Amino acid sequence: MPVLLPSTDPGQDSRVGAPEWRQAAKATSRKAHLLTDRCGQEAVTMWQPKDSVLDPNVAHHLGRAAYMEPWRFRVEMLKGGGTLEKPPPGEGVTLWKGKMKPPAWYARLPLPMHRDARAQQTAEVVHAHARGARLTAARLGRAQHQINGQLRLLLRQREATDRRLSEVRKGLLINQQSVKLRGYRPKCEKIPDKADSLLVWEKKELKSMKRKMEKDMEISEDLLKALASCRDTLDFYCQERLQAVELMNQPLDKVLEQAGRHSWVDITRPPTPRTQGLKTPPPDPIGTYTPACAKALFEAKRLLMESKDILTEMAKNEVDIQNQQQEISNRVCSSLAQKMRETLELKERMTMTLGLMRGTIHRCMKFNQEMYVTRGIIKGPLLKRNLEAREKLNRPLVRMYQRHVGTQLPEATRLAQGTDLLTRHNLHMEKNLKELRTTHDNLAWGLNCKKIGHDVDYDVVRLRLRQRHPHVCYEQAQRLVNDWDPPTPARSQTNTASK
């Protein structure tokens, strides 16, 4: 007997449930499916890579395949013809079995280890701040040490420059004393010569050196103040940073070695031989390396470079001025020595002339005395009774001869003429002797003046050689100028010269 089976394709009319009931069930199922997808998607997005957002306009499987493509290993060809698979660069977990390297995932919600993670992050931040403070303190301390070294060099150079300035001032005092001492020469020796011109030139050059050295001292003083201020600023910032690292037991030099930098200020020294050093970090107003620290280090670097140039210039000026001052002093001393030699030559010539004149005066005096005796002999005796018989004109034979007017004897006339001639000659000799004596006295006074001038020049040279010795300080030379007063020439010599 045939059996009737129900149709497998249920028709619209064969359904028992109501359509509303069926639509409600489908809506509930669809709503649950959407809720499941949304919740699953939200649960996954709480723990996924940062750039894992897919394009909504692309199918899910296509977007996922495109997103996972960079995770796969790269195949590189070797020189020998083989291949080598390498994971892609970057952070992530390498899956060697699956030949993939997905990127690191980040959680957006706190996990069970959230408290420990936050504590670890806080410790890392604090330790990073302490390390940064320690590194900054090490940099500031090293910069302060270099500034201190530059300060010591500058102070030492200032002492050398000050000693040279004292020598220049002492040279001015020696020049003043030389001019003052040469002013005590006799008037005839004060005719301006090359030695006086050299003394004036020496004074001018010494004043120029003095101004130059004083300018160097002023520049170095300003630089010294700037270096001291920079050192105090670096010390303040260093002590401020050391408050955060006073419990850390690592020396600051070791920190600089770990950073790969020996100094952030001295750029002239060779770098520390390391593979790679840390660069100077950018200034951070709320970090350990603040703009104030950066400004202090930059100022220290600038002052260090400027001080090196100034120290080089000061040392060069000191050596040049020392050589120039020595050369000028030697020229003045050689000029005075030449003047002394010329004075000695003139003294020898004047001494010879004075000796010849003395002999001439003696001969003239002797001849004059003889002429006076001759004049007395020619004039005859004073009394008549002392006449000889041959000298008497009242003899009988003579009176008989003189009876005629034309036969008068010329004896008396010729005796009177001879006596008058001798008298005029004696007067002329007296005049010549007076001129000779006056010239002799003037020559003797000139010789004495030459001797005084030679002695004064010798004293000036001796004074200059003694006073320019390094053991003679500026105060000793100053006391000599203020207290010592050489004696003036004698009054009798001055009166003799006026004659």
From Swiss-Prot:
Coiled coil: 201-225, 308-328
Chain residue ranges for the region called Disordered: 265-286
GO CC field: axonemal B tubule inner sheath; sperm flagellum
GO biological process: flagellated sperm motility
Localization of this protein: Cytoplasm, Cytoskeleton, Flagellum axoneme
InterPro entries found in the cross-reference section: Tektin-like, TEKTL1
Domain of life: Eukaryota
Function as written in the Swiss-Prot or TrEMBL entry: Microtubule inner protein (MIP) part of the dynein-decorated doublet microtubules (DMTs) in sperm flagellar axoneme, which is required for motile flagellum beating. Forms an extensive interaction network cross-linking the lumen of axonemal doublet microtubules.
Subunit structure: Microtubule inner protein component of sperm flagellar doublet microtubules.
Name of the protein this chain belongs to: Tektin-like protein 1
Gene coding for it: Tektl1
